Amino acid sequence: MVDIVDKALRMGEGRQIKKLENVAKATNALEDEIAALDDEELKGQTAKFKQRIENGESLDKLMPEAFATVREASKRTLGLRHFDVQLMGGAALHWGNIAEMKTGEGKTLVATLPAYLNALDGQGVHVVTVNDYLASYQAELMGRVYRFLGMSTGCIITNQKPPERRKQYNADITYGTNNEFGFDYLRDNMAWEKSDLVQRGHHYAIVDEVDSILIDEARTPLIISGPAEGDVTRWYRQFARLVLKLNRDEDYEVDEKKKVVGILDPGITKVEDYLGIDNLYEPNNTALIGYLNNAIKAKELFLRDRDYVVTGGEVLIVDEHTGRILPGRRYNEGLHQAIEAKEGVEVKAENQTFATITLQNYFRMYDKLAGMTGTAETEAAEFMGTYKLGVLPIPTNKPMIREDKDDLIFRTKKEKLAAIVRDVAKRHKKGQPVLLGTASVESSEVVSSLLDVAKIPHQVLNAKQHDKEAAVVAVAGRKGAVTVATNMAGRGTDIMLGGNVEFLADAKLKSEGYSPDDTPDEYEKRWPGTLAEIKDQVKDEHEEVVKLGGLYVLGTERHESRRIDNQLRGRSGRQGDPGESRFYLSLEDDLMRLFNTQLVARVMAKGMPEGEPIEAKSVSKGVRTAQKAVESRNFEIRKNVLKYDDVMNKQRTVIYAERQAVLKGADIHEDILKFIDDTVLSYIKGANNGSDKPADWDWDGLFKAISSVYPIAVEQEGAKDAVDKLKGDKAVEALKELIVSDAKDQYSDFEDKLGSEGLRQLERRVVLAVLDRKWREHLYEMDYLKDGIGLRGMGQRDPLVEYQREGYQMYNSMIEAIKEETIQLLFHVDIERVAMTEDEETESDEDEAVNAAEAVMGLDGEAAATGESAPAEPETDDEAEKTTIDELADEQKNEKGIVGMQPISHAEGKVPANKRPKSEELHSPWADGRTFPGTGKNAQCPCGSGRKYKMCHGQNEQ
């Protein structure tokens, strides 16, 4: 099936390549003409192109001239001329494809072509890389080309402050990592001031190492979180000690393949005895099960120096695909705290999600998306299905002559490692550079220690030495170099035989005190001479290493993904250089042990001689089968993550659009008046007990509830008399008009005291405060819903459909709550205080007045915006058509599968199991004086009455 899909996707590939070749030919035809321009004339091309775009000329028509201009600027600044295949790659990127270009083909230089072309219309271009170092290095190096042509370059890196970020985003071309771009988007949607925004829209993105970012990292959503309420760190420490007393397969079981654990009956007994409780599964003890499962996972499934490292008293996650540390990332749902307790470091507070988005949905926001990688072909179907990106293989500039040897497979890891050391010693003795690829920090340190014993000098590059990554890789191709590195995916510095000329030239100039940022004129002046000097030094060594066979890549084990194996191999044989690659495997490697156990057992039973490699096609086939099994599993995980996030994505898009409109000064006065109408109507319908007759309505409950929203002046008896002779909808409408008229009269008095502009500003700040808080609560509820939704499958119901349905119900309930609490807050704000604030033209007192009103109502008035935002003001029309909150709510009522849905209990989505009512309580009469702690007041009451909690048992809360 996969082969059929792959063939279908490749239909028409020849025609596409022909189009790319035509672009290269058209660009070449202009080369002499552009080369004849002096520096000032060449720089003047940019202004001419912009004018032609203003006059209506398309970017496609400009492309050959723009590419020829960039090529000439690159020759004059960097001494690098784009090859024809690089021009083809640039055209593929401009047309919104993935350009599959082998390692060493100059992808960084290729990006300058479409980046310059697409920046001409002034909307900004984002070039996405895998780490801060590469973002800085590429922005600095390629920025010389852009600056020569009058284009500005920015770079987004960790720890920049909002004003600096805004400046970088305002540049024509901005480099940065996928995480920084994504988190800035989330922070922009938590900002409280228009001046705090940093991004300016999502026009065009070029993603380097696109498979690493859009495939490998797509399983993990971006999350901004803050401390949750309550201190539960002692439980993590207690369970970390407890699980040390439990034995695997006796007290609990572990499935390493699926990464799940389960407690067995003997283990349950031990846990209950240790904690001094009678029944671990009683409702009051339910939360303890989560601590127990996380403690077992931390003990058995998450290993130090493989999944994480401990540095400076912190547990830092290691990216399984690239071997890099992921600063700031934490496992969720209490797992990170369990690992911290296991390692004996400070257990940090649990977090609550404030904002989240998957990488898939973030990058799908761009008007145009493109990417580059050396290994996209195996994931072509996923790129097309998820991102609508085609994959175009770009020919190499010179033929590939690397020799890829068959795998050598040993029975045990010990035998494999001994053979690896012998092979490396032989290669090192003759001076051939060797790159050893490992799958984890732990493996790299084991290999390093064995090389130390063999007295083979070497460099180690793993998550613990990530700061010297580029320097190590730049010299990994020198004669006699031996480099041990964790996964090479995303290592953006080329391994050049004899040494990386550009890197060494840049390092020499910087050591002499020259930099393209601080001393650009002197740097550019000295660059050609320094580059020529380094080239001469490297040339002889390059030729010597070529004679020795080029770079030898030795993989110490197969990775779960064939792509990452191919990326490791691809470090050798760049630009027509010779090279060699081979993988050493053992039947004890995780990939074989977990995913091909029967084959392993069969081969081991044959009793092969110790130290002899196994040569069997069945074993090599078994490796490929195991890799395909893991790739298939990971693809399903990514698909699942996306399906569930798509439910949230539409909601998030509308909420964020509404929030941005408010933040930028939209007049929402008419919305506020409608909120009053909707809130009053909701209360009346909630109090009618299903009866058409006003005499049967709960008048006491209704007036008590409405008086909590605003100081109602309508007399209860007078209201009853006014609708006594009416029935059904007429009675509801008459009562609504009576109460709404009273509320709007009082609200009009506020406007008289504050003035129109003063009230408009207050309305915006109150809506932001309420919207942020209710959105956080909604994310919290949706997390709880998703955690337990898988169990619906046991009842023959599709968990995803259930999640969609209940998620939309919860969303609509949140919208009601936003309307109601906005009105409630506005009527509780100290108007005199706000009026004084307006006179002084300050906002801090106004915010305090809003917070004080929240405190009166028992709400948390703190803004969610933790962390500093940054992008520039989006260049969008404030009057542009947008979907409103109400429109989405109405639309969702008509969604397929949503019609006729019964209301759900928010308690199931939000309240932890140990706080939920017992089943025998669910049918109790509503006026029995009980309360259900933790239930949202706009949620349906857990008693089963069908009423909102605040109109039911919530009335009994003090």
Swiss-Prot record:
Assembly with partners or alone: Monomer and homodimer. Part of the essential Sec protein translocation apparatus which comprises SecA, SecYEG and auxiliary proteins SecDF. Other proteins may also be involved.
Entry cofactors: Zn(2+)
Start and end residues of each stretch annotated as Disordered: 863-883, 902-937
Primary subcellular site in the record, as a coarse category: membrane
Subcellular location: Cell membrane; Cytoplasm
Organism for this UniProt entry: Bifidobacterium adolescentis (strain ATCC 15703 / DSM 20083 / NCTC 11814 / E194a)
HAMAP family in UniProt: SecA
InterPro entries linked: Helicase_ATP-bd, Helicase_C-like, P-loop_NTPase, SEC_C_motif, SecA, SecA_CS, SecA_DEAD, SecA_motor_DEAD
Binding site for ATP: Q86, G104, E105, G106, K107, T108, D494
Family note: Belongs to the SecA family.
Any single biological process term in GO: intracellular protein transmembrane transport
EC primary class: translocase
Binding-site positions, Zn(2+): C941, C943, C952, H953
MF annotations from Gene Ontology: ATP binding; metal ion binding; protein-exporting ATPase activity
Keyword line: ATP-binding, Cell membrane, Cytoplasm, Membrane, Metal-binding, Nucleotide-binding, Protein transport, Translocase, Translocation, Transport, Zinc
Name used for this protein in its record: Protein translocase subunit SecA
Membrane topology term: Peripheral membrane protein
EC number: 7.4.2.8
Annotated Gene Ontology cellular component terms: cell envelope Sec protein transport complex; cytosol; plasma membrane
Coiled-coil residue spans: none
Biological role: Part of the Sec protein translocase complex. Interacts with the SecYEG preprotein conducting channel. Has a central role in coupling the hydrolysis of ATP to the transfer of proteins into and across the cell membrane, serving as an ATP-driven molecular motor driving the stepwise translocation of polypeptide chains across the membrane.
Catalytic activity: ATP + H2O + cellular proteinSide 1 = ADP + phosphate + cellular proteinSide 2
Gene (UniProt): secA
Gene3D superfamilies in the record: Helical scaffold and wing domains of SecA, P-loop containing nucleotide triphosphate hydrolases, SecA, preprotein cross-linking domain
Keyword RNA-binding among UniProt keywords: no
Keyword Chloroplast: no
Details of cofactor binding: May bind 1 zinc ion per subunit.
Alphabetical list of SMART domains matching this protein: SecA_DEAD (SM00957), SecA_PP_bind (SM00958)
